[in-house]
């Protein structure tokens, strides 16, 4: 039997007394009064901040949104199925923040920036607030660099610049996501980090986009943030801010970023659901009064930063879905007024076989030619004018039976120019290819080609120039201008290819 010496006991007690730390910890704790539908009402959180993160007993995280006189209304970032009336809630003293870093590139994450692609954890050490203030006036400079989408109709007539916010708007199934994903594919080799935010979409649709990006090697510079249709409204509401925060990390490091929010109608619906459950007074179309601020504070974070801040940029392409082409509904008008222009996709044009179904007449870019390279400016001006005149004449020609020769010629050219704007999905064109394509159309080289052969002719011509007259593309690519030398070579190439094409067609 071991004998314990009294001195040993006393030394152990003395040591314990010396190590005793009389630290007082103050924790702000409340009690759940009511819970359900992703909303909790809590009593007793006296010193909670608006937007502060709360921790429930089962580990679920919530955000305090409604601070009322006798209770706090919080939304939960999870199911919260085990939370009961009377269970305790702890205020964390933190505002919502997410980890950020280079390691996120090529990954698929949720609104809390946690990986959902099964490729393991993402190593990061930096954090950024989910709701950061937008850069001020002095922190910005005007948009002057082009962001090429690879789509002729957009790059020629509705150009987008780095740091711009351009809305993509249209009915369901008109190719809005296709325009956005084509823009991502076209950023390959341009040193642009792309963030694709999928809000409230079918998991199958998101998987399809991710597969397309992986197949084309675009995931190497892309981050996908996804909250599917079955996700809690809180997470669908937060997803766009997560995308903006991840892009901001790169923007403030002097990099160029492109963020696509697909789509903000779903985010507004999720926010409406949260607000109505929190018993906030409904406004127009039952949306809460601050739904404009919901989108403005998100889109104002897109900017072209000043030289002092490293000249980084964040370009935002928000997507909004309309019902039966009604652009005067609440959310579409809100987002149109916040953005620097809109690309309107028409269901009628889509069904008529014009894809991408861009309605050039009511689409606009408020940055304009400042976001175009000189070569594109040289050829694009005439294209827009010819198409506008064609649209007017086409409407008139439906009523007139006998048209003069000049009008018939103009209509014939207009039909060929419209063919020129058609493009297959996931087949973006480089600037030099676009310039040569538009030049061919506006200078009458397509007038003798049958309308149904125009696309085949142009595809063959682009390949022929790349193979036999590569200097044309090289001049435009390096000088960014369409010089007389390039023009002479291009004329020669078109005439030579046209002879061969006519011979094979015959």
Curated annotation (Swiss-Prot):
InterPro entries: ATP_synth_asu-like_sf (IPR023366), ATP_synth_asu_C (IPR000793), ATP_synth_asu_C_sf (IPR038376), ATP_synth_F1_a_nt-bd_dom (IPR033732), ATP_synth_F1_asu (IPR005294), ATPase_a/bsu_AS (IPR020003), ATPase_F1/V1/A1_a/bsu_N (IPR004100), ATPase_F1/V1/A1_a/bsu_N_sf (IPR036121). SUPFAM superfamilies: C-terminal domain of alpha and beta subunits of F1 ATP synthase, N-terminal domain of alpha and beta subunits of F1 ATP synthase, P-loop containing nucleoside triphosphate hydrolases. Its EC number is 7.1.2.2. The record marks 363 as: Required for activity. One of its GO terms (cellular component) is proton-transporting ATP synthase complex. It catalyses: ATP + H2O + 4 H(+)(in) = ADP + phosphate + 5 H(+)(out). It is a peripheral membrane protein. The keyword Nucleotide-binding applies. GO terms for molecular function: ADP binding; ATP binding; proton-transporting ATP synthase activity, rotational mechanism. Disulfide bonds: none annotated. It is found in: Plastid, Chloroplast thylakoid membrane. Produces ATP from ADP in the presence of a proton gradient across the membrane. The alpha chain is a regulatory subunit. F-type ATPases have 2 components, CF(1) - the catalytic core - and CF(0) - the membrane proton channel. CF(1) has five subunits: alpha(3), beta(3), gamma(1), delta(1), epsilon(1). CF(0) has four main subunits: a, b, b' and c. PANTHER family: ATP SYNTHASE SUBUNIT ALPHA, MITOCHONDRIAL. Belongs to the ATPase alpha/beta chains family. This is ATP synthase subunit alpha, chloroplastic.
């Amino acid at each position: 039997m071991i004998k314990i010496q009294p001195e040993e006991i006393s030394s152990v007690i003395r040591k314990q007394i010396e190590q005793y730390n009389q630290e007082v910890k103050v924790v702000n704790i409340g009690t759940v009064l009511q819970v359900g539908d992703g909303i909790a009402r809590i009593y007793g959180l006296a010193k909670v901040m608006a937007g502060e993160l709360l921790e429930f007993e089962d580990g679920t995280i919530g955000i305090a949104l409604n601070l009322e006189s006798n209770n706090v209304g919080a939304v939960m970032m999870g199911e919260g199925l085990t939370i009961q009336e009377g269970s305790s809630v702890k205020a964390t003293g933190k505002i919502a923040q997410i980890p950020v870093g280079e390691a996120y590139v090529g990954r698929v994450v949720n609104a809390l920036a946690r990986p959902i692609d099964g490729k393991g954890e993402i190593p990061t050490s930096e954090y950024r607030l989910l709701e950061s203030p937008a850069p001020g006036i002095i922190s910005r400079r005007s948009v002057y660099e082009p962001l090429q989408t690879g789509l002729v109709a957009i790059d020629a007539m509705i150009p987008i610049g780095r740091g711009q916010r351009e809305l993509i708007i249209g009915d369901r199934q008109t190719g809005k996501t296709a325009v956005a994903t084509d823009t991502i594919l076209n950023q390959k080799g341009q040193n642009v980090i792309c963030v694709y935010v999928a809000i409230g979409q079918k998991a199958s649709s998101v998987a399809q986009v991710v597969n397309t990006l992986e197949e084309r090697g675009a995931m190497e510079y892309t981050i996908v943030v996804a909250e599917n249709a079955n996700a809690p409204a809180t997470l669908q509401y937060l997803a766009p801010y997560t995308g903006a925060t991840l892009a901001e990390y790169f923007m403030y490091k002097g990099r160029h970023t492109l963020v696509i929010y697909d789509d903000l109608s779903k985010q507004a619906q999720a926010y409406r659901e949260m607000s109505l459950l929190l018993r906030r007074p409904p406004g127009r179309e039952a949306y809460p009064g601050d739904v404009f601020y919901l989108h403005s504070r998100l889109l104002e974070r897109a900017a072209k930063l000043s030289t002092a801040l490293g000249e980084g940029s964040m370009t935002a392409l928000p997507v909004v879905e309309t019902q039966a082409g009604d652009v005067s509904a609440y959310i579409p008008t809100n987002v149109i007024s916040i953005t620097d222009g809109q690309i309107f996709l028409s269901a009628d044009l889509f069904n008529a076989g014009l894809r991408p179904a861009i309605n050039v007449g009511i689409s606009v870019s408020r940055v304009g030619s400042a976001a175009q390279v000189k070569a594109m400016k040289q050829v694009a001006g005439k294209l827009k004018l010819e198409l506008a005149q064609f649209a007017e004449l086409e409407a008139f020609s439906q009523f007139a039976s006998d048209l003069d020769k000049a009008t018939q010629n103009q209509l014939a050219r207009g039909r060929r120019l419209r063919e020129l704007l058609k493009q297959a999905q996931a087949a973006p064109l480089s600037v030099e290819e676009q310039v040569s394509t538009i030049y061919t159309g506006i200078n009458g080289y397509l007038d003798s080609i049958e309308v149904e052969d125009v696309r085949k002719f142009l595809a063959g011509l682009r390949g022929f120039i790349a193979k036999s007259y590569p200097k044309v593309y090289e001049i435009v690519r390096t000088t960014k201008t369409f010089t007389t030398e390039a023009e002479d070579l291009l004329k020669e190439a078109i005439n030579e290819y046209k002879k061969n094409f006519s011979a094979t067609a015959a």
